[in-house]
């Protein structure tokens, strides 16, 4: 049976790729926020509860035709929506490639899907907490790199990264030959960058058993072991 495992690495400001990584996280935030802005305006337009604005269409003349088609289409995550976000990324000349742009949009899709699920639960009175539509990212946004953009050359040298990175993030020798599926970089609560390497590992599936042993650390005895089946308990004295 294969299971997913995660290894974490901290990225220091002195790292040779820190500036590049920071740029990627900022670009990811801008792409996420731009895509989310469009979705929020569409949501406000359909809800008739908020003021909405389509003035942003005029800011991108080359995308105007696509925008208007998308508004008429009135579907959140259509093929046309993905195309608009990819064209926006190219227009802004971001360093993030289109595969990563798609990952960012997919993450936004998950956020909106969660909102609709919670809204349905609230309407069915199975959820009573306040819910909000997905908000904008403030400073950075997670960037996920799948195995298609992971540099095999760097991985052999003991680094996880893309071809555009000067060096990549140093990993331990035991991680070189892992079945690496992707890695992602984000900023944590302390505003520090963290890299997570996600890999798959084959593990032996253990058969479930009804037999249980319980260990109790005692005062007079060092410990006592009791069983839930026909076996005499064990008591070990400390002296």
Model-derived segments and their meaning:
Residues 1-239:
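Nucleic-acid substrate recognition interfaces
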């Amino acid at each position: 049976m294969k299971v997913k495992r995660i290894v974490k690495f901290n990225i220091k400001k002195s790292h040779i790729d820190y500036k590049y990584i920071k740029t990627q996280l900022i670009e990811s935030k801008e792409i996420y926020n731009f895509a989310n802005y469009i979705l929020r305006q569409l949501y406000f337009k359909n809800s008739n509860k908020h003021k909405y604005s389509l003035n942003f269409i005029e800011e991108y003349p080359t995308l105007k035709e696509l925008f208007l088609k998308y508004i008429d289409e009135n579907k959140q995550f259509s093929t046309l929506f993905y195309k608009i976000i990819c064209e926006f990324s190219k227009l802004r000349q971001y360093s993030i490639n289109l595969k990563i742009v798609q990952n960012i949009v997919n993450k936004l899709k998950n956020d909106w899907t969660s909102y609709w699920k919670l809204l349905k639960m609230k309407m069915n009175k199975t959820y009573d907490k306040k819910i909000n539509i997905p908000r904008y990212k403030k400073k950075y946004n997670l960037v996920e790199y799948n195995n298609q953009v992971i540099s095999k050359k760097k991985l052999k040298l003991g680094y996880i990264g893309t071809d555009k990175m000067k060096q990549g993030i140093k990993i331990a020798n035991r991680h070189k030959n892992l079945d690496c599926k992707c890695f992602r970089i984000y900023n944590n609560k302390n505003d520090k960058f963290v890299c997570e390497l996600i890999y798959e590992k084959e593990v032996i599936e253990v058969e479930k058993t009804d037999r249980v042993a319980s260990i109790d650390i005692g005062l007079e005895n060092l410990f006592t072991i009791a069983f839930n089946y026909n076996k005499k308990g064990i008591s070990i004295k400390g002296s």
